[in-house]
Amino acid sequence: PADYEWSDRDHRVVYMFDAHNLFDRTTSTYNKEWRVDEFMEGLSAAGVYEPAIVVGIDAPQNRYDRFAMYSIGEWEYRRRPDTRRLHRIHGFGDETAAFLMRTVKRYVEKTYRASRDRERIAVAGSSMGGYMALYVGARFQQQVSKVMAFSPVLMDFPMRGYVLRDEIVRAGVSQPQRIYADMGDREVLDFCGPRELQDHLEEVRLTLEQAGHSQVRTRLAAGDRHDERAWARRFPGAYLWAFDGVEAD
């Protein structure tokens, strides 16, 4: 935040996956960025809502390595329905989550004026990073009170989305959380189209409610595709809802 150097207060923290796409398009995969830093600077300048320290978690550029980092257990990925070539993914998302909460978070809190109050801590991500945000939120409720999952990929095939749903049910609700999840209505992936993505988002919403979560917000964004520009447009509203209870489309 802009006042970090001259203030002595602790700051909100958002831990976000895919750091290379968050702040600068020159480091991004597709020359698109979330503009998270510009948003936080705008909050500082306006002085109405509190900005946050944003901690970006880097990810491998290779898509299969990224799939492994952001999923649980073994599964097979076929890029196109008409190809027989399969990539076996050995997911270690449970280790990713533990590293984030037990190593990165502790380092950040020791090194910076980052709040340790769970009410001031969020985790966020998009696509498979959205899957991981939901997983971290379920598993580490004592440390995280806000979850933001943008266009989360939650398919049972190929990436075993039912494992995430099972974890949400198993974890239940030990602490209240505000959970935001969304999807664009024009999103298409190699292995599925808009309807399948939306159906699985709805399935996770129902699972969250079944588990006992009462502060869940899902959104279907008209015209949005599966990319950083869409997530950049939706991030401000999600952040303000999660931290400040601001209701906006």
Spell out what each predicted region is.
Residues P1-D249:
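Non-catalytic cap/lid and distal C-terminal segments of serine-dependent acyl enzymes
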